[in-house]
């Protein structure tokens, strides 16, 4: 009987080792690459587009390329452009865009008429110009007070659906997501670049 129990114990140990090896192998095998985004970068004169849709007071920044994606989730391509310029509140009526402060709104108060007076950016203010359906321009937004050094296309889940969003990284490494909720743009913290290291 003792011999039988030893063999049974070894058999259980062997089966457990096989299952453990399979589990570890499944964790270390790299997953298939995510499908490439269907968004392509079209050839367009961004400076002329910005001047036409937002006014000639905005100058396109050269350090961050325009970002194309479906930010308003309607199936058409939108564009996000980093620009510098004068106070965007002055051109809202003439160029029919909406100025938003999604960063300060995430902390409770995002009225750009007030929060722009307390801007902590040093030097020239940088804005994110959002143009929905840029080929046949739709809604337009100027996002102010969003801290960023890097800006890139990202993806996130919103109301159980995958959506395009902007991923921002500020000078301290804090990462934020800028996304459209159907009415306005929102900013929320998503982590830190230091977390990934």
Predicted feature residues:
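Sec-dependent N-terminal signal peptides
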Residues: 2-26
